[in-house]
């Protein structure tokens, strides 16, 4: 929860606690979850200190702000734990690129398809790129045909994220593993 600032480290405060709460009145919630009501901040801080706990501003946007009497270090630990679990559950796709030329031979194309299949089996997205140069641009249909051929050969394990599209001197196709799609 700290970040480096020129001159040293500064703690990033997401929540204002104890004497850092500067509003005159707060809506207080006890440590067991019962609503105490709107009271002066000094009184709320005294109640928290009497129980050896912290007064934490939970909802600063409310009028008056909602504060809770809790153990702040335990609260911070639980928040970090929730954030860590949320990061674990995120799906991370890595995009692997396979480049081909429009005049690729059949064997070389099979090797490229094999590489794409390995990437897809590994759970990654695959972006296929057909590179054109010079007068090859007049025959973009060759690149599109090659992309369609690759799409058909990998149809058992992947499906296209979107249609084959071209941008500049390239033609693109992005394939996503079927088991990753919901």
Curated annotation (Swiss-Prot):
Give the matching InterPro entries: T_IF-3_C_sf (IPR036788), T_IF-3_N_sf (IPR036787), Translation_initiation_fac3_CS (IPR019813), Translation_initiation_fac_3 (IPR001288), Translation_initiation_fac_3_C (IPR019815), Translation_initiation_fac_3_N (IPR019814)
Sorted alphabetically, the Gene Ontology cellular component annotations on this record are: cytosol; membrane
Q: Which family does it belong to?
A: Belongs to the IF-3 family.
Functionally, this protein is described as follows: IF-3 binds to the 30S ribosomal subunit and shifts the equilibrium between 70S ribosomes and their 50S and 30S subunits in favor of the free subunits, thus enhancing the availability of 30S subunits on which protein synthesis initiation begins.
Q: Which organism is it from?
A: Endomicrobium trichonymphae
Which UniProt key words apply to this protein? Answer: Cytoplasm, Initiation factor, Protein biosynthesis
What are the subcellular locations of this protein? Cytoplasm
Principal localization reads: cytoplasm
One GO MF term attached to the UniProt entry: ribosome binding
Subunit field text: Monomer.
This chain belongs to the protein called: Translation initiation factor IF-3
Q: Which GO terms describe its biological process?
A: ribosome disassembly
- NCBIfam families documented for this protein: infC (TIGR00168)
Keyword Iron-sulfur in the entry? The reply is: no
